Design a protein with these regions (language model features):
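Short, compact, well-ordered microdomains
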Residues: 73-116
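Conserved mixed alpha/beta catalytic, RNA-binding, or beta-rich assembly cores of soluble enzyme
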Residues: 1-68, 92, 109
Length: 117
């Protein structure tokens, strides 16, 4: 059994119920293809928000650091990052990019995608 999780944009909580991500995982479709049925979705986290609402960069944000520590302690091996990481020009949010780097630095594989992009 492998434990995986999702990382999504805090701001997207205003309009997203995570239905697409969860449905893709449940059906093992899109970016979740290839996972066995015993794969465990063990974490769902958000970023620390936009700079305009939270001036702390992810490296300095106690909440993000605590979340990543918890992912490691729970033995989450892969984090899938939602399409909400992309702006209208399909450019990835720099805060999400940094969080992905932080995850990889701690040995957690990052997959950019959940359901369709």
């Amino acid at each position: 059994m492998i434990k995986i999780g999702t990382l999504t944009c805090l701001h997207s909580n205003n309009v997203c119920a995570r239905v697409g991500c969860l449905k893709a995982f449940q059906n093992r479709s899109d970016f979740f293809e290839g996972y066995s049925l015993d794969t465990f979705l063990g974490a769902m986290m958000t970023c620390n928000g936009c700079k305009s609402t939270n001036p702390k960069e992810p490296d300095e944000d106690e909440g993000i650091l605590e979340k990543i520590d918890r992912l490691v302690s729970e033995e989450i091996k892969v984090m899938h990052v939602g399409a909400c990481r992309l702006d209208g020009k399909k450019k990835e949010c720099p805060r999400i990019t940094r969080i992905c780097e932080m995850l990889e630095d701690r040995g957690i594989q990052v997959v950019r995608g959940t359901h369709r992009e």
